[in-house]
């Protein structure tokens, strides 16, 4: 029993010496820190030591109350703490040695480490999902990786949006082309319909004109006889009334006044009638004998004025109405 107690005691002292040696090795192997960051590193070390030494104080108080069994428990409880400190020492030393190699490794494996969750354990100390502590350089690299990942995601988002926009534009262009084709088709159909309608109307007009021409050709003889008889009535009316208003003649034959004047002039040129149209819109019919009598009076007197001609004309010309017999008329020349 005494030997066992001695072995436990020796093992406890050895554990303490190993712990002190590990701490010394940790501080000796730690790289030099610039003077500007000394205070910050000291504060971080003090906080880390306080967190690590807190369970040791509680554990060291237990042997005084529990005896040999307490020392065995103390050794068993210290062992994980020592192992954790050894791992921390190795990780801190490997961070500075592998900084150059990790740069190339990070560039070649851009996707690696993107999913790591980073959390702050203490000021200046960061841990990932696995619980391992991460140095400042590693943290900066992880942040850089995260920024690159976000940049890649943003570029991918832009590409997807551009692709989506291009597809929408292409669909809109297709719809526009289809609409233009449909409008062109409708326009051609409308033009064809208008052309057919126009041809139909032209055919109808042609057929109507053709039928009218046929009717006119069939009624030429009748129209010639009617015009001849109407012309004879016109001449008879002028001879009977002797003095006629042009408006009365137009009303009588259902024609315009201008047509009456033109017809009188035409008949005068043809020698069918003779007379004058005064400035008051009257036509005075004068026979050839009466005109010859007036001409003889002028030739006999030589120089005469208008009053003398008027007086002699009233004496020589008979202005009373006469009934003209159709048999006594001169033959009418329709040519």
From Swiss-Prot:
Keywords: Endoplasmic reticulum, Membrane, Transmembrane, Transmembrane helix, Ubl conjugation pathway. Pfam families: DDRGK. It is found in: Endoplasmic reticulum membrane. GO terms for cellular component: endoplasmic reticulum membrane. Its main location: endoplasmic reticulum. Residues 1-6 are lumenal. The chain crosses the membrane at residues 7-27. Residues 28-335 are cytoplasmic. Residues 41-56, 91-103 have a biased composition (Low complexity). Residues 104-117 have a biased composition (Acidic residues). One of its GO terms (molecular function) is ubiquitin-like protein ligase binding. It is a single-pass membrane protein. Residues 37-124 are annotated as: Disordered. Substrate adapter for ufmylation, the covalent attachment of the ubiquitin-like modifier UFM1 to substrate proteins. Belongs to the DDRGK1 family. This is DDRGK domain-containing protein 1. It comes from Dictyostelium discoideum (Social amoeba). The lineage of its organism: Eukaryota, Amoebozoa, Evosea, Eumycetozoa, Dictyostelia.
